[in-house]
């Protein structure tokens, strides 16, 4: 059973007055989950979700303040009551909503962004949730008029299944490269393949999706 996604319209509003974009998904485990923009109140749940991956150096470890500063880049997958259970109906819905997945889209230039901090709870692995989060981030990139999406990952087969291809070097011209060098963002330094961040990228695949 593959995860299905259905966009739903809500009357929920962010502090800016703009309505949130929410996508309702049902996974292979029958759980009902909502993909939505992250809020500051989600930061600690995101940090706790990422922590075991960061401890294994699968994802970059970040201070709590970094999540607050970047929260507008994140979407979360929130598991909510109302799921249908697993194949045998034995998987209960949570009594209260919980964050079971996250991902971020960081714009690096006028035509390119990076997928960052894509993670799901261990008990949601294999349900299609990671793919649903990634598809939503790619959809956001398209809506913003971006042409390419970059990722730095150990999960080459997963991203490859979504159209990402391995790359060598830095896929920008010299003028853009020199402008990007002005940034203090480590993720952008990894995109540029700078020597100072090489220890952080060992074993990772550099991949690019053309939209």
PLM region spans:
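C-terminal "cap" of GNAT-fold acetyltransferases
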Residues: 172-211
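Conserved acetyl-CoA-binding loop-helix of GNAT-fold acetyltransferases
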Residues: 120, 126-139, 150-151
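Short, hinge-like loop/turn segments at secondary-structure boundaries
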Residues: 53-54, 167-169, 185
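Conserved active-site alpha-helix within GNAT-family acetyltransferase domains
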Residues: 143, 147, 153-181
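A conserved beta-strand-loop-helix scaffold within acyl/acetyltransferase catalytic domains
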Residues: 58-75, 79-80, 101-120
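Short amphipathic alpha-helix that is part of the acyltransferase structural core
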Residues: 8, 14-60, 78, 98, ...
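Ala/Thr-enriched low-complexity intrinsically disordered regions
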Residues: 2-10, 16, 87, 91, ...
